[in-house]
Regions:
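N-terminal short beta-loop-beta anion/metal-coordinating cradle
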Residues: 1-63
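Generic non-transmembrane alpha-helical segments
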Residues: 23, 135-150, 206, 245-253
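Proline-aspartate-enriched helix->loop->beta-strand connector
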Residues: 71-74
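Mid-sequence, gly/pro-rich, charge-dense loop/helix-turn segments that line enzyme active sites
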Residues: 84-190
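A short small-residue
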Residues: 118-120, 220-229
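A C-terminal functional module that forms or caps the active site or interfaces directly
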Residues: 172-223
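His/Asp/Glu-rich mid-to-C-terminal helical/loop segments that flank catalytic regions of hydrolases
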Residues: 225-254
């Protein structure tokens, strides 16, 4: 990591990275099967990479961005499933807290969560989550003021077209694709999470070790319930483009 290094731009799947159509690529390097694109986004130098799905891939790629490429910060751009029933497909969540919901100890038929790296045993810290720095949060809020992030068509709502809303909140990370309304309700109730994905908290664990700022931006492609396996492919491209608009603006202040 270098204070004057480029931004690291991460995505999990091709559609999430392709949504950044203003990305100018100058050269490429392949490491560990991942293609790192060196170039610019707007006025900022950056290294962009499609890291793959899940926590292990995300942690590996984040480490390479910070150690091999000297990135000063990481932006994660992508889609997620919604947990908060008040949110809709196309809404955007900027994570001000990232929680790994599937790490911990199985006790009495339930998972008791612990922070990754902490032994999941009695007597050890039970504090969980990675919080967005408050001063960076305010910079992001100011930068996003007045930004038109678009929306999704009537097919996403079953009625009228929906103008995307931008929300700061808790995002949950785990190695599952959630297609279960009951579990969605439990996770929302237990953790206060408003969106769920498969990489963010793993990247946060790495970023914390390096002392690097991280901002995770997720547009909702589905609502993590019984229809998510159909909604995800249907609204993936539109949601990825919405997230990319937000990330482009945040790149000016991180």
């Amino acid at each position: 990591m270098r204070a004057d290094g480029p931004i690291g731009l991460m995505a999990a799947i091709p559609q999430e990275l392709a949504a950044h159509d203003d990305l100018v690529v100058r050269t490429e390097r392949e490491i560990a099967g991942c293609r790192f694109r060196l170039g610019r986004l707007g006025t900022r130098d950056l290294v962009a990479v499609e890291g793959g799905i899940g926590k292990s891939h995300a942690a590996m790629v984040a480490t390479l961005l910070l150690q091999e490429f000297g990135c000063s910060s990481i932006l994660f751009s992508g889609v997620a499933g919604g947990l908060d029933p008040d949110l809709a497909i196309g809404d955007v969540v900027v994570a001000d807290r990232l929680v790994m919901h599937d790490y911990g100890a199985r006790v009495g038929g339930r998972l008791k969560p612990y922070q990754p790296g902490v032994p999941p045993l009695p007597g050890f810290s039970e504090e969980i989550g990675y919080d967005l720095d408050q001063s960076l949060r305010e910079k992001i809020r100011d930068a996003l003021e007045g930004l038109d992030i678009g929306g999704v068509g009537a097919a996403a709502t079953g009625g009228e077209p929906h103008r995307s809303r931008l929300i700061f909140g808790t995002v949950l990370t785990g190695d599952i694709f959630l297609n279960d309304a009951q579990e969605r309700e439990r996770l929302h109730r237990t953790f206060g999470g408003i969106a769920i994905e498969m990489e963010g908290a793993a990247v946060a664990a790495v970023a914390e070790c390096f002392g690097a700022p991280l901002v995770v931006v997720r547009a909702l492609s589905d609502l993590a319930g019984t229809e998510s396996h159909m909604d995800f492919p249907a609204f993936l491209d539109a949601a990825a483009r919405i997230a990319a608009r937000v990330v482009g603006r945040i790149s000016t202040v991180i």
